[in-house]
């Protein structure tokens, strides 16, 4: 029953469009009926127009903002606060007032006066520079704090602490390979053998002394043997002489 009631319920637009008994005449009722039927379409059109107008306003605002930024970032050339359009206006007014010949004469007079005042202008510039330099020096000397004037005592090279840079300067030792280990062991063995050989052999000075002592000992032994032989030969001679005399 509920489903049947929902299906049989008229739609809202039909309910809005159904004429109700009113005291108005038939022409006015028809007109109101047309307005009620065209109401959703009118609302759609108004929403479309409002959205389009909003987009147009956004575009216009963006254009104005871009123009403002471009104007703000532009470079304006000016001389003594006078821009190009202002200078053009001043020139046109001067031309109208003085005329071409009068303007030329005014320009010549201005040039002559500027040339005459050039040395004075230079002198004024030099004086201003000197005055500025003196002021800067005085202000700089006055502003220097007393802590800046203090100089720490100098230290001699002997008193300066030695800085151990061995740990910083030495590079990190790379790991040894098998070939390097073999070479190191061979070098150590050769060094130990050479040290043992040097300890066994006496130095050349000792060798010379030993040779000299051995030669002196040999000479003494040979001399002693010669003296003993001579001593033994003399009694033999005496004995032989005695035997001969007895005969």
From Swiss-Prot:
One of its GO terms (cellular component) is chloroplast thylakoid membrane. Residues 77-78 are lumenal. Residues 1-76 form a transit peptide. The chain crosses the membrane at residues 79-99. It comes from the Eukaryota. Disulfide bonds: none annotated. Belongs to the TatB family. In thylakoid membranes, TATC and TATB form a large receptor complex, containing about eight TATC-TATB pairs, which binds the precursor protein. Twin arginine signal peptide promotes pH-triggered docking of TATA oligomers to TATC-TATB receptor complex, inducing a conformational switch of TATA that results in activation of the translocase. TATA dissociates from TATC-TATB upon completion of translocation. This is Sec-independent protein translocase protein TATB, chloroplastic. It comes from Oryza sativa subsp. japonica.
């Amino acid at each position: 029953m509920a489903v049947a009631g929902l299906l049989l319920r008229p739609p809202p637009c039909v309910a809005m469009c159904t004429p109700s008994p009113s005291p108005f005449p038939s022409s006015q009722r028809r007109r109101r009926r047309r307005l009620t039927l065209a109401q959703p379409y009118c609302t759609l059109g108004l929403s479309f127009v409002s959205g389009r107008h909003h987009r147009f306003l956004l575009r216009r605002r963006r254009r104005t903002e871009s123009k403002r930024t471009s104007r703000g970032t532009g470079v304006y050339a000016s001389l003594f606060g006078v821009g190009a359009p202002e200078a053009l206006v001043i020139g046109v007014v001067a031309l109208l007032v003085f005329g071409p010949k009068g303007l030329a004469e005014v320009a010549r007079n201005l040039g002559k006066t500027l040339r005459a005042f050039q040395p004075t202008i230079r002198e004024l510039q030099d004086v201003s520079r000197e005055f500025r330099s003196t002021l800067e020096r005085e202000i700089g000397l006055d502003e220097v704090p007393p802590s800046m004037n203090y100089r720490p005592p100098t230290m001699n090279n002997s008193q300066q602490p030695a800085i151990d840079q061995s740990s910083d300067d030495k590079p990190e030792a790379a790991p040894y390979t098998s070939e390097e280990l073999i070479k190191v062991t061979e070098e150590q063995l050769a060094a130990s053998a050479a040290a043992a050989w040097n300890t066994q052999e006496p130095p050349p000075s000792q060798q010379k002394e030993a040779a000299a002592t051995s030669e002196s000992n040999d000479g003494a032994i040979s001399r002693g043997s010669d003296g003993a032989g001579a001593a033994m030969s003399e009694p033999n001679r005496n004995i032989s002489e005695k035997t001969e005399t007895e005969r």
